[in-house]
Amino acid sequence: MVRWLTAGESHGPALTGIVEGLPAGIPVTTQDVQDALARRRLGYGRGARMKFEQDAVTILGGVRHGRTLGSPVAIQVGNTEWPKWEKVMAADPVPAEELDGLARNAALTRPRPGHADLTGMQKYGFDEARPLLERASARETAARVALGTVARAFLGELGVRIVSHTVAFGEAALPESHPFPVPEDEARLDADPVRCLDPQTSAAMVAEVDDAHRAGETLGGVVEVLVYSVPIGLGSHVHWDRRLDARLAGALMGIQAIKGVQVGDGFATAARRGSAAHDGIARGADGRPRRTSDRAGGIEAGMSTGGLLRVSAAMKPIATVPRALPTVDVATGVETTAHHQRSDVAAVPAAGIVAEAMVALVLADAMLEKFGGDSVAETRRNLEAFRAAVPALPEPGADVVEDGPMGDPLP
C-alpha cells in the first residue's frame, strides 16, 4: 500500500512530505522535484508570491544516487520567506515584547467566507484565524506535488504517462470537439498562460482573468487530467473503497478549493439516453476487445478498462476576494468585511499540476495493489506478464450468427 502524508504551514520554515510503499529503483532527483514545483507556480492570474517563491527542495531520505531505495521517501520544501516569519510562526514560545507591534502577528479576527477561518476557529477553539489559514493554505500542495513527482516517475517506468489541461476558466470553456492533449503536448501547455492548447479559447480565458482582476474579483475553472497506457483492471468492483473512480475522486476533492469531480464525460452523461451514454465494445487490431469511445473516462464498475483515463476537477473562485466579503469580527461582534491576505486572482492552471500529482499517487497505489513488486523491475515483469495473458477474442467461424439474440439473462 502506498501512503503519503504532508506536514508544515504556509509561512513555516518548510513543508515536509513522506511517501511510503513505492518500490526500489524509481529514477528521481532533486532537480526533478524542483522542475515539478516550478510548473505548479505557472499560470495567468497568480499573485506576487509566485515571483519570489523559490521552493528550496531537499530530499531527506529514501533516495540514493538518483534511485529510490524502497524505503519511505521524505522531501522537504523550504520556505524562502521564513526569516520574515521566524518569530510569528516559531514553534517555541516567543516573549510577548518581541511580538508586540509586528504587523504579521496581528490577530486575524475577521474570518473570510469560503475559507477554513470561522469553522476552524469554532472547531479547534482558536480566537483568531492564523492557526487555521496557515495549514489550510494551498501552499501545502507544494508538498503533494513533490511526492507526486516520485509516483509519476514510477508510472513512467511502466509506460503510464499523465498530462493535464485547463478546460474552463470562468465562463470561457474549451469546445467539446477539441482533441485531447497527449503527453508530448506538456511543454506547449506549460508555455500557454492558462495551459490551454486552443488559441482562441486561451485568449478568452485570459480575458476572463483580466476582467475579474479589474473588478476586484477572483475566478475558478475546470481542469482535466488524462492518463495514457493505463492497464486493464486497476481498482475493483467489490467494495466502494476499492473502486478506482472513488479513490481518484476523493484524492481530487482533497485539493484545496476543488468543489466537484467528474470521471470521463461525467455530468454530461446524465443528460444522455443510455444508447448514447456508454462506450461500445469492438474487436481491436490486436484481436482483443477495445472500447469505441471514452465516455466513461477509462473506468467501468470501479475498474480501469485499459483505455484513456480521464478525470476533471472544478475549482471554485479563490475565497480571499480583494472586494472583501461581509463577515463578523469575532473579537468585537461587529459586522464588517473580511480581512484580505495576499492572494491570486486565479490558480486554475496550477490546480492542473496538483491534480496530476494526486492522480499519480492514486494510480501508483493501484498499480502496486494489482501487480506488486519490491523493485521497479519486478513490477514491470508482473505487468508485462498480465498484459500478455489477456486473451484475444476467438476468430468468428463462418457459421456464427452475427447478431444472434442471447435472451434475457434475468428471466
UniProtKB/Swiss-Prot annotation:
Q: State the residue spans of region: Disordered.
A: 278-299
Q: Which cofactor does it need?
A: FMNH2
Pathway(s) this gene product operates in, as recorded in its UniProt entry: Metabolic intermediate biosynthesis; chorismate biosynthesis; chorismate from D-erythrose 4-phosphate and phosphoenolpyruvate: step 7/7
Q: EC no.?
A: 4.2.3.5
Q: Does the keyword Flavoprotein apply?
A: yes
Q: Which GO terms describe its cellular component?
A: cytosol
Binding-site residues for NADP(+), renumbered to this chain: R40, R46
**Keyword terms, alphabetized:** Amino-acid biosynthesis, Aromatic amino acid biosynthesis, FAD, Flavoprotein, FMN, Lyase, NADP
GO MF assignments: chorismate synthase activity; FMN binding
Q: Which Pfam family, any one of them, does this sequence belong to?
A: Chorismate_synt
Q: What class of enzyme is it?
A: lyase
Q: Name one GO biological process term.
A: amino acid biosynthetic process
Quaternary assembly: Homotetramer.
Could you say which protein family the record assigns here? Answer: Belongs to the chorismate synthase family.
- What name is this protein filed under? Chorismate synthase
Gene source species: Micrococcus luteus (strain ATCC 4698 / DSM 20030 / JCM 1464 / CCM 169 / CCUG 5858 / IAM 1056 / NBRC 3333 / NCIMB 9278 / NCTC 2665 / VKM Ac-2230) (Micrococcus lysodeikticus)
